Amino acid sequence: MSVLHVNNVSKSYGKHQILWNVQFSAQQGQIVGLIGPSGSGKTTIIKLIMGMDYPSAGTVEVLQKQVPNLSLLKQIGYMAQSDALYQDLTGYENLTFFASMFLMTKEEQQERIAYVVNLVQLESAIKKRVATYSGGMKRRLSLAVALIQNPPLLILDEPTVGIDPELRKSIWQELTRLKNEEQKTIIVTTHVMDEAEKCDDLVMIREGRVITTGSPQKLKDDYQVTNLEEVFLKAGGEAHAHQSIS
């Protein structure tokens, strides 16, 4: 089942165009990576999927509903690039606050909080103020917040930036488990190519344009190279040449 469909989306701010005809889909139980350097348009795409902004052209559909749509808010879990947490509250109080935004009974809230705290391994720190957390602990709490309402679609903007390799590995193990066991659809932005290898499908973006899409292995086969950095460079070069001709 198609959970997300981005259909020929362009975005401009005044005369400054950010995105050109971006198109891709994500199926249920799939991790899709948006791959590209800083400033390529990844976060703008995320905002359009979330309904935080409108496309200048094209449409975004989540679960067969056009975005923005208030009824979709409970269906999307979002982890921003910078942690949107209340520093003076404890981890537990943060989770209770975010859980209260969704129509859950007290019992459901407690069940979900216990589940996500265990999931991100924060049991020993959950009653401490977030201001005392390390960067990695804050990222883990942000992931817990994104999962609190048990959404079918997870959108994670650079989820492992600034955390140690061991924690990064554990987060990716958890994302893979969520995909396989709970059939979550997960959209991840990253510029780290070894993380890109863990995705089912990749959407490579350069200067606001999709330069190529496909599974990591298919892309390496299609471009006859051994790693994704080479795919990006080769696809980017071909796209640039095509733009110059047209």
What kind of region is each of these model predictions?
Residues 213-214:
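ABC ATPase "signature
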